[in-house]
């Protein structure tokens, strides 16, 4: 898998390190950068709490920047006001598969002597000005969780263009906890199960899976403790398993096919929304969007989900809050609720249409019919949402 990824990114295999989860890759990168207590990391206020946690594990401070409502990426014009003498890193996230304007972020970083980390957990397969996501800044990290275009059930990896960072990450990789037999069996079981879940079974399957993982009864994207407090689990710093490597080695070959499928589905959704006079997601000229998720703003999210549940339509809920999926007691994770109004408002109204490889022609037709039936529950634009709230 390391060799295949190196070939995909046109880098040396020594520049790639493999992990149990993407968040472990981020932790290793921050550690390699010698991030410590008191250091500040700038990141978008529209992310997952498991991205925030590694910052807190090292005693550093996450500093949140509001988002651009068109791209759902960090608003570059608001970064400067967040920089202090303690700022060390800007975390540049590819939200839903869309790269931010990295040239502008790198200009800011150069001005203040900061490191830019590309958060490509959504962005595998996309590009910025023709360059693959993850290959612009000195270092990047990726997630290979089950809902990503390149998946090893769970997992992650880092790509470092900086030789010193690559060496440190390789040293840390040798220190990672080795997955046990239970981990190997769990990966194989989840891979088998996911391949067989149809859209009709999506809601009961996802509800059961989330409940089991929240209560630490099954391996999930996030365990219960990670969502309750920023205390690093004992087995957090874990390496990739043999089962993940075997799956990943096969799946790399299919990445282009998977991403082309997502783009094709997104184009159908674009056509639908334009026909309904609803603004489709913004696609800037500088980036190739891979549409990990297809975002849509709705008037009443709970009601919309209930309708989808009833009609057996798959929908996603990224992001329920600026630090998804946490929806209360934000100060536990150092998030200052009320300071990022755009992200906070969007996170109350956003849903995602699926673009994954399970969406065949029949399911696509069902989703389109569902959207047409419920068009009155969808905002035509971000500005309409703001005016009505």
Predicted region positions:
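Phosphate-binding glycine-rich loop
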Residues: 2-40, 49-58, 64-66, 131
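Short beta-strand->loop structural element characteristic of the AMP-binding/adenylate-forming
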Residues: 61-71, 316
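Active-site phosphate-binding strand-loop segment of PLP-dependent enzymes
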Residues: 70-171, 352
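Conserved PLP-dependent catalytic core of the aminotransferase class-I/II
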Residues: 175-181, 222-223, 256-281, 303-310
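Conserved PLP cofactor-binding pocket of PLP-dependent enzymes
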Residues: 179-185, 268, 281-285, 301-340, ...
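Alpha-helical membrane-targeting segments
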Residues: 179-249, 253
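Conserved glycine-rich beta-strand-loop-beta hairpin in the small C-terminal domain of fold type I
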Residues: 230, 236-252, 263-270, 280-295
């Amino acid at each position: 898998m390391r060799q295949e990824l190196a070939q995909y990114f046109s880098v040396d295999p020594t520049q790639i390190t493999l992990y149990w989860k993407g968040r472990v890759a981020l932790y290793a990168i921050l550690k390699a950068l010698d991030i410590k207590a008191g250091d500040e990391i700038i990141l978008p206020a529209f992310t997952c709490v498991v991205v925030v946690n590694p910052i807190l594990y090292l005693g550093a401070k996450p500093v949140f920047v509001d988002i651009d409502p068109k791209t759902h990426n960090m608003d570059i014009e608001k970064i400067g006001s967040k920089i202090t003498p303690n700022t060390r890193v800007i975390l540049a996230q590819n939200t839903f598969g869309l790269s931010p304007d990295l040239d502008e972020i790198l200009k800011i970083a150069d001005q203040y002597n900061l490191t830019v980390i590309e958060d490509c957990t959504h962005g595998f397969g996309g590009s910025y000005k023709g360059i693959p996501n993850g290959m612009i800044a000195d270092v990047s990290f990726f997630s290979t969780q089950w809902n990503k275009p390149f998946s090893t059930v769970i997992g992650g990896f880092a790509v470092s263009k900086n030789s010193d960072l690559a060496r440190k990450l390789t040293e840390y990789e040798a220190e990672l906890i080795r997955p046990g037999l239970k981990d190997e069996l769990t990966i194989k079981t989840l891979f088998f199960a996911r391949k067989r879940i149809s859209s009709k079974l999506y809601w009961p399957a996802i509800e059961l899976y989330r409940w089991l993982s929240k209560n630490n009864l099954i391996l999930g994207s996030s365990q219960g403790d990670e969502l309750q407090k920023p205390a690093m689990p004992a087995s957090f710093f874990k390496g990739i398993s043999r089962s993940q490597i075997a799956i990943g080695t096969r799946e790399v070959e299919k990445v282009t096919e998977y991403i082309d499928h997502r783009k094709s589905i997104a184009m159908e959704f674009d056509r639908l929304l334009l026909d309904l006079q609803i603004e489709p997601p913004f696609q800037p000229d500088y980036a190739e969007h891979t549409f990990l998720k297809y975002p849509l703003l709705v008037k009443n999210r709970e009601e919309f989900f209930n309708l989808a549940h009833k009609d057996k339509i798959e929908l996603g809920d990224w992001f329920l809050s600026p630090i998804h999926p946490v929806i209360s007691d934000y100060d536990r994770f150092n998030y200052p609720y009320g300071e990022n109004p755009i992200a906070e408002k969007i996170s109350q109204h956003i849903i995602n249409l699926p673009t994954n490889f399970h969406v065949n022609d029949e399911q696509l037709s069902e989703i389109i019919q569902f959207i047409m039936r419920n068009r009155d529950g969808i905002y035509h634009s971000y500005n309409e949402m703001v005016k009505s709230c």
